[in-house]
Amino acid sequence: MLPLCSERELNELLARKEEEWRVLQAHRAQLQEAALQAAQNRLEETQGKLQRLQEDFVYNLQVLEERDRELERYDVEFTQARQREEAQQAEASELKIEVAKLKQDLTREARRVGELQHQHQLMLQEHRLELERVHSDKNSELAHQREQNERLEWELERKLKELDGELALQRQELLLEFESKMQRREHEFQLRADDMSNVVLTHELKIKLLNKELQALRDAGARAAESLQKAEAEHVELERKLQERARELQDLEAVKDARIKGLEKKLYSAQLAKKKAEETFRRKHEELDRQAREKDTVLAAVKRAHAEELQTLDAKVLELQFLCETLEGQLRRAECTRAEDAKEKNALTDKFREDAAALKAAWDAQITQMSKETVSKDFQIHTLQEEEMKLKAQVARFQQDIDRYKQQLSLAVERGQSLEREQVQLGLDWQRRCDDIERDQIQKSETLIEGLTKARDQVAAKLQETEKALRQQETLLKAVSLERDQAMETLRTHGLLPGQEAQVPPQQHEGEIRADSPSTEIQRLQEQNAGLRNAVSQMRREMEMLSGHLPPAQPEECSNADPDPKAGGDSTPPDYVLTLEAEMQNLKHKLKALEEQLQSTEEPVKTSVATADPHHGVHSSAAAADAALADQTSTALALRKLGDRVHLLNLLVTQLKRKLRQKPRELVPVQHEVPSEVDQVHLEVLELQKQVAELRKHLKVTPQGEPSSREQLQRQGVADRYPMGMEDQTESPTFPQEGAQPPQTIYVTHLQRKLKDAARKILSLRLEREQLLEMGNRLRAEQGHAKGKPTPCPGPPTSEPQDPQEVPERSLDRGPPLGQLQPYSTTQDPRHTKRRCASEYAGKSQPHSAQVGSKTNTPRGHKAEMASRPAQLSQKQHRIPTETWKPVYQKENRTPKLPQAHEVPEESDHRTHRSSSLASSSLQDIWRLLELGSSPSGVPSQDNSVAECPAPSRPSCFQKVNRSPVPIQKAFAVKGLKMEAQPKATPPRPSKSHPAKPTNCQQQRPSRIRNYNLKD
């Protein structure tokens, strides 16, 4: 019985212990939930404190703005002081006037003495002895007075000079000291502002991380609550027995909460006391701010208070981190205990005693943790009190530096005004020098180019005369050969010739004659061609030497201030990038049109060579094939060059877009890079337009051959060009039939229509280029505003906004001549003037460069219609006067080196070298095009990788080129994105006949006193 009773008692004891253990587990879970909720409440309280601190920071910023207004008032007082100083100077001038009056009195006294002497001389006979004595006395007195007056004048002048020298020395010393101190102070304040901004950003990042961690802790707490609810459902019976223990724990919690509330009340009272102290401090300083010197002290005090508040924020953030770490430790402990509970459920009953001991140890650890938290709060309150004492000491120390700041600011204003005046004067002087040098260089280049064009025209005239002489010799040779053949036939019929000569057939003899005559003609033509090549190469060498000896423009000295580093944060591309893209699309369409012309010229030549009789007209077919091959090689080379240039422009535009879409950098390198890249793109566009015009002219010159082959080429060219996609025609042309219009008139009318379209598009390009220049001027004006310098404002427009369809007609008919330059204003940007001259030069020479006139002055240009601009189809068809094509044709081959050589070198040296290399390469390309146009047989290229065909294998090479027209078109195709060009309204511009000179508009001078606490 004893063992049974002992077993029952043990079972009951085990059940009681098990219930007690479960109740303790539930109570422990409740305690952990309460601790988590208390930590969340503390976190909310800290967030409220942080919000209040932010509001205090905003209030401090408002106080700083009030201080800035007071500084402006100080500026007004400083101007009044300057006025008083000017009044003192006026008083000094009045004193000088009084000195002059004294001198006049002295002269009057001298005159009176002379009159007395004259009177004494009249009475000399009666009173000679007395008069001599009186005269000697008077003379001695006058001499003594004169010496005294001269001594006084000399002393006064010496004192004035000494005072002037001392004033100058004092001014220089004060200026030097002020500049050094201002630079030092500015550097220190900038470093402090950067540190403060970095600290604020780090605090914001830390707060975000803490918010994320708290959210994760809340989720974990929710999951723990769910698990605890399940445990409570299982252990409801054990809770009944442990209610007394729970009441004791609740009492302990109440005591702990009461103590926490007491500490919070103390903290709140300390904060209220701090606020009251701050209010009293602020009121005292507001009263002291009524005086001039003590108002600036509050500014420094607020700055230091702001720094200390940031330090307190750091301390509070560290406290929050510490609390989060404690919460994480508690959660980890809860998870460990939960795992231990799962293991202990499956363990033996003997381990319950050890679990009870573990619960007691955990309870003791929690109590120690709570005591540590209270101690840390007491320590925080003590640190806050110490920081308040430090703040008061710092405010007392910073009151001494305010007077020096005021003096330094006044001296800085004077120094800045003097520097601005000197800078404006230097800019005007350098601009005048650059304008004079540019005019001289442009005049020299124009005279040189006119001489070269005249020499080229003379060489062309000589070549035409030699061709006429060759034709006459050919006709004479043919007539002589026919007479000789007739004589030989008559001799053979009569039997007068010997037997060997009679056996020779007449056809073979005619073949020998025809074989001999072309060889001599070819030799003569080759000799003439070699002479022409030598002349052209000599002219090219002279041009390159002259372009190499052009002097660079004078450097412009200007001091750029530090602009706003966060200006221009918009990632959308500006208008001038869109205009560059529109010009790129125009050039791509030009390339496509030239490729279509090349393909249309290749196919007729191929058919004519295939259908020609091999035994009849050998010389004419070979000459036509050689000329066609030369034209194909020259056009292929030029098209490849244009493709490379278009690819380069694509790269430049993408680089500009990438730079604008990236994170905005400092404004100074952007100011230096963007105008230079825009200028480079402009130069490339001008060179491409010139080369397109020359290629168009070169393609329209048909090779001289038999009339039948030429008519066939024209017919097939018309048949091939019409289906190539001219979008502006409503009716598709057909092949000429019997009784229809001849193909030559159809081709001429078609070319006239295309020339009108090309002229209209070139004028639209010119308007877009002018808009781009205006945008660049606006950008420079904004840069000048950001630097705080007086910028030139454009003059009022003299003409009202006009219809964009009427602007091209006026620019064609009323534009100034090419050699005439517009007047330069002294306040205009030299880079703008250079680019404007270049754009006007290109805009006036480009519409006429596409015309190659015959004796009837028929236009023969060609340009494909753009598919992406249907809005331009309804514009007016502008008529280009045909009387003015000759002088423009003489001036269309100008090199782009001339406007580029006078560009002011505001950029680095490598940019100037790059621009000169681009100009020299464009010059070499133009000379190669001249050589290609003058030579009847193709000239081997040095830059491109086109294989050269030898003279005997020309027909085979020609066939190979004709067999594969599709790969050539693919090789010259330019890949790009289609963009719909948006129509832009042309801004109102002043008329070119009366250009309005811009004047300097005196803008409102911004405040020179910088607030170092406010971020830029």
From Swiss-Prot:
Domain of life: Eukaryota
Biased composition (Polar residues): 846-859, 934-945
BP GO annotations: centriole replication; cilium assembly; G2/M transition of mitotic cell cycle; microtubule nucleation; positive regulation of mitotic cell cycle
Disordered, as annotated region: 500-519, 549-573, 781-921, 933-1016
InterPro entries tied to this protein: CCDC57
Protein name, entry field: Coiled-coil domain-containing protein 57
Compartments where found: Cytoplasm, Cytoskeleton, Microtubule organizing center, Centrosome; Cytoplasm, Cytoskeleton, Microtubule organizing center, Centrosome, Centriolar satellite; Cytoplasm, Cytoskeleton, Microtubule organizing center, Centrosome, Centriole; Cytoplasm, Cytoskeleton, Spindle
Subunit structure: Interacts with CEP63; the interaction is required for their location to proximal end of centrioles. Interacts with microtubules.
A GO cellular component entry from the record: centrosome
Location of region: Centrosomal targeting domain: 1-503
Organism annotation: Mus musculus
Keywords recorded for this protein, A-Z: Coiled coil, Cytoplasm, Cytoskeleton
Higher taxonomy: Eukaryota, Metazoa, Chordata, Craniata, Vertebrata
Principal place of residence: cytoplasm
